[in-house]
């Protein structure tokens, strides 16, 4: 350790993931005696936003499957790890986690810390599922420490044989960095709602179902568009707002993408920076998040903080963030009919919406406020390192 500081290298495949899930944690670690290096495929401005507390290294790599990256990246990271002599390599997202686990093991890094945020192989079938499950198991094997995002996902990983129980655990009751209630409470939500609805051409008095995240198949967007179009036949004042980038690696069907572009009541905002997420959520009347799989659901915690009623799926992660019928409503995954039924319920019952929203905010205050989450991570890492 240099100058009594713990040298930590945090890695994600792309910088958007780093921005959304990692940088607040790394900034907190830097304040508490860690020497931090950030490695990812950086977008413009990433280094400038984070260089006040961390060394930033741009490492271009692909999000999708790439044989070229599989050959090159472990070697590049190995040389970086040997040169910098990190005490900890801390990796998140599938591709870079595989590369970093290999490189860290070869370089003799004593703490190889894997944040297992959702298991992509569960959405695959046949040989593809077998291959990607083997990759996940290999990444876990080369890691010294694995942190899963929820208790149910942890148990699933153990049951699937990905990782022995003694190597994998959950920080707090789950999640990553939670929601900044300080930021949520720092702006006028009614003003943000009217301003952003005007910006996107959304009726100010319309009823809005909203989604935040990558617009892809695994997030249940095909089912969401299908359910919304059915609901729209009954209620002409409903709208659907999809906040996030279109995901070419796991796209929705061409038919649904065309529907989203042609329907005057569906709005695609594109990606927005993390600093604007809470304001965009203020446009919504209900958050709809019909994902197939999830680590824990940071966006659900954020929606709770903003005071939104939530519809999400009964899968590991989301079903642990919300209490069904109390702080959220659970639906079956891959089921547009069940989703439609719950969207109709939320539309019809204002009192129920308010009850769900109030309970969700209280739950966010108790478990998911960012200072609580960041302190949990710091204590867990210090305990892991014996400091």
Task: Give, region by region, the residue ranges found by the protein language model.
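A short, active-site helix/loop in glycosyltransferases that binds the activated sugar's phosphate group
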Residues: 44-47, 143-183
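A conserved mid-protein helix/loop that constitutes part of the nucleotide-sugar donor-binding site
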Residues: 19-24, 207, 211-230, 329, ...
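Aromatic "clamp/platform" in nucleotide-sugar-dependent glycosyltransferases that forms part
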Residues: 292
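Glycosyltransferase donor-sugar binding loop
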Residues: 40-44, 175, 212, 239-252
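Conserved acidic donor-binding segment of nucleotide-sugar-dependent glycosyltransferases
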Residues: 324-325, 329-336, 345-350
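Short alpha-helical donor nucleotide-sugar binding micro-motif in glycosyltransferases
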Residues: 81, 271-272, 279-284
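Nucleotide-activated donor-binding/catalytic signature segment of Leloir-type glycosyltransferases, i.e.
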Residues: 253-272
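Short hydrophobic beta-strand element within catalytic cores of glycosyltransferases
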Residues: 300, 309-312, 322
């Amino acid at each position: 350790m240099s100058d009594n500081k713990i040298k930590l290298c945090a890695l994600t495949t792309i910088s958007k993931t780093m921005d959304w899930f990692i940088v607040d944690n790394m900034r907190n670690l830097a304040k508490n005696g860690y020497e931090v290096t950030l490695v990812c495929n950086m977008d413009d401005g990433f280094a400038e936003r984070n260089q006040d507390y961390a060394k930033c290294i741009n490492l271009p790599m692909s999000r999708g499957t790439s044989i070229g990256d599989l050959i090159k990246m472990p070697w590049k990271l190995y040389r970086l790890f040997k040169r910098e002599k990190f005490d900890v390599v801390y990796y998140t997202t599938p591709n870079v986690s595989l590369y970093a686990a290999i490189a860290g093991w070869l370089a003799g890094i004593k703490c190889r810390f894997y944040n297992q945020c959702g298991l992509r192989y569960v959405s695959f079938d046949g040989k593809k599922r077998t291959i990607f499950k083997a990759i996940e198991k290999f990444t876990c094997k080369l890691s010294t420490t694995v942190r899963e995002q929820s208790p149910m996902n942890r148990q699933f990983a153990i049951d699937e044989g990905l990782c022995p129980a003694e190597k994998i655990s959950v920080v707090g009751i789950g999640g990553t960095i939670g929601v900044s209630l300080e930021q949520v409470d720092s702006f006028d939500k009614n003003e943000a709602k009217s301003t952003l609805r005007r910006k996107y051409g959304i009726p100010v008095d319309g009823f809005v179902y909203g989604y935040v995240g990558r617009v892809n198949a695994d997030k249940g967007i095909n089912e969401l568009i299908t359910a919304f179009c059915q609901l729209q036949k009954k209620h002409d004042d409903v709208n659907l707002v999809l906040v996030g980038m279109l995901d070419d690696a796991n796209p929705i069907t061409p038919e649904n993408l065309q529907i989203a572009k042609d329907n005057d009541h569906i709005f695609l905002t594109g990606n927005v920076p993390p600093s604007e997420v809470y304001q965009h959520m203020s446009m919504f009347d209900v958050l709809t998040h019909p994902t197939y799989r999830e680590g824990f659901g940071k966006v659900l915690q954020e929606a709770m903080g903003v005071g939104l009623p939530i519809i999400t799926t009964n899968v590991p992660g989301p079903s642990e963030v919300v209490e069904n019928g109390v702080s959220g409503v659970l639906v079956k995954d891959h089921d547009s009919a069940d989703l439609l039924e719950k969207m109709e319920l939320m539309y019809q019952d204002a009192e129920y919406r308010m009850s769900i929203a109030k309970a969700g905010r209280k739950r966010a205050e108790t478990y998911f406020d960012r200072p609580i989450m960041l302190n949990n991570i710091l204590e867990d890492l210090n305990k892991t390192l014996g400091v």
